Regions:
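Terminal targeting segments of Actinobacterial cell-envelope proteins
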Residues: 1-11, 19-23
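Aromatic (tryptophan-biased) beta-strands that constitute blades/sheets of beta-rich domains
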Residues: 7-14, 28-79, 87-88, 93-109, ...
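Repeated scaffold domains used in trafficking and secretory/extracellular systems
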Residues: 65-76, 104-118, 147-161, 190-206, ...
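Long, acidic/polar, low-complexity amphipathic helices and coiled-coil-like
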Residues: 91, 95-225
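Structural recognition of the beta-propeller blade-terminating site
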Residues: 93, 134-136, 174-175, 228-234, ...
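Acidic, serine/threonine- and glycine-rich low-complexity intrinsically disordered segments
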Residues: 185-321
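Intrinsically disordered, low-complexity segments enriched in Gly and acidic/Ser/Thr residues
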Residues: 282, 290-294, 303-372
Length: 404
């Protein structure tokens, strides 16, 4: 008969040591993990939906202000105004600015944007600004998340149903569930044969629609920029690509992608003379709008209702959102010069101007009324948006709420 195995004192000590090592290792992993640094405080109750303003206000006054250096324009989704500053993204009451929910990861934010019903915070890790977390804006509860290879700095934009994130060497387009639709540019390792593993070109400007992406690239040993049109394909890292030469448009020029529709892209080029060209999906220029002079370094674009508006630094060009057909230009008049792109309020185009807002017929561009508002001087574009009946302005790193 085999004698039962006896555990010695040494065995017990060894087993205890293993348990301690495993526990310490787990504790160290947790201590250095994003989970330990994440602080999520959902809303006490679901946030009610906003109701659109039905009339244009006759007066405006400041309601509240908040730091929001990580948004590039007012972010409104799920009944809240979303701000991002430092390491924290907040969902705020549009009327009062009070915090309804908060989310932070213990690291400086790369940027904040919105998509569908989510507020999206992007944080850095060892692979760049590619840690994205979606928060249901109406509840403050966590939704989808993703981790991606990215540049150390990225620019974020949204069309409402997708997000574009791009830096100097790489871009990605994400669906509302943060699943990647398109990736393009630098890879840190060869994943598939035929997919480049090194940066080919520097990405200088990009914009997207749910159906396509347009990006300008400065490529090695090339004096001119090129425009690249991307469409999602079966493999996200092998999109359909159409490259368009931009002769005479230097790699250090201020050329930029203004907006993208399903099959067209609006781009600004400075040569042979300043103009906005509309490029179709085959790469052909199908329309051009000449500008009286080049835009300033301070430009901005908004997509509101069925129009796209582009602020050039002293005027606002308005295009049809679907086909990017040029409609009209809002220029300085009566001592009032535009200081940012437009938004839409109660069916009227609302343009921030020197001492307030001017309203215009959205279809014809005919001037209507002026709403007085005193602002401190700003050296950036003033970018407006609506949150119900509250008018928001992104003024550099500050978000300002206005009402009657």
């Amino acid at each position: 008969m085999v004698k039962p195995e006896r555990r010695t004192k040494a065995d017990l000590i060894a087993a205890a040591a293993i348990v301690v090592v495993v526990a310490v290792g787990a504790a160290l992993i947790w201590w250095n993990s994003d989970a330990r640094a994440t602080v999520s405080r959902p809303a006490d109750r679901p946030v009610p939906a906003l109701h659109a303003a039905k009339t244009v206000p006759t007066t405006l006054r400041e309601l509240w202000t908040a730091a929001s250096g990580k948004t590039t324009q007012p972010a409104v989704v799920g009944g809240v105004v979303v701000t991002g500053d430092g390491d924290e993204m907040l969902g705020r009451d549009p009327a009062t600015g009070s915090t309804l929910w908060s989310y932070s990861r213990g690291r400086e934010l790369c940027g904040v944007t919105t998509v569908y019903q989510f507020a999206v915070a992007v944080y850095p890790d060892g692979r760049g600004c590619g840690q994205a977390s979606a928060i249901d804006a109406s509840t403050g509860r966590r939704g989808p998340a993703r981790s991606s290879l990215a540049d150390a700095e990225v620019k974020l934009s949204t069309d409402g149903t997708t997000i574009l994130s791009y830096g100097d060497s790489r871009l990605e387009q994400w669906r509302s569930d943060l699943v990647r639709m398109i990736s393009y540019g630098y890879l840190d390792a060869v994943v598939k044969p035929g997919v480049p593993a090194s940066p080919l070109c520097r990405l200088t400007s990009a914009a997207a629609s749910p159906a396509s992406v347009a990006v300008m690239e400065a490529c090695p040993k090339q004096n001119d920029l090129r425009l690249t049109l991307l469409k999602a394909a079966k493999e996200e890292d092998q999109p359909d690509v159409k490259r368009v030469a931009l002769p005479g448009v230097g790699v250090d020029s201020d050329a930029q992608v203004i907006a993208v529709s399903e099959t067209k892209a609006a781009i600004y080029v400075p040569t042979p003379q300043p103009c906005v060209n509309i490029i179709d999906e085959t790469g052909n220029t199908i329309a051009s709008t000449l500008l009286p002079h080049p835009p300033t370094p301070v430009t901005a674009t908004t997509r509101v209702g069925d129009v796209v508006t582009w602020y050039t630094g002293d005027s606002v060009l308005v295009f049809d959102a679907n086909g990017l057909r040029y409609k009209y230009t809002v220029s300085a008049q009566g001592g009032q010069a535009p200081i940012g792109p437009a938004t839409m309020l109660a069916g009227h185009l609302l343009v921030p101007v020197t001492s307030g807002y001017d309203t215009f017929d959205a279809q014809s561009g005919a001037g209507q009324t002026h709403i007085a508002l005193a602002r401190p001087p700003v050296n950036t574009a003033v970018i407006p948006a609506l949150a119900g009946s509250v008018l928001l302005e992104q003024r550099g790193s500050q978000l300002v709420a206005l009402g009657q």
